[in-house]
Amino acid sequence: MKMPKHNDNYQYPLDETWTTAEIIKVTTFYQAIEAANEGTIATADLLAAYRDFKTVVPAKSEEKRLARDYEAASGYRIYQTMRAAQETNKQRFQYRD
């Protein structure tokens, strides 16, 4: 029996200085990553969520730190998921590592 990679009870890595709108954008992106790893998501929706995420987190160093924290908590890899999503030409996307 294959065990799930993620922990269902984890907190998203967030910055306490973000506004409510920014927290919603980042949380929506994390949920899109989860959808891509657990099932399927419209590729356009995932890419749009990433664009919104980047308006909140424009610095590459902060993005990498949040991605590390998110992977440690959830087991999902943002960089690999997004790289695969950006390379696909399919309307629906499902990440497989």
Swiss-Prot record:
Cross-referenced InterPro entries: BH2638-like_sf, UPF0223
Pfam (any one): UPF0223
Source domain of life: Bacteria
Family: Belongs to the UPF0223 family.
UniProt protein name: UPF0223 protein lp_2149
NCBIfam families, per database record: PRK04387.1 (NF003353)
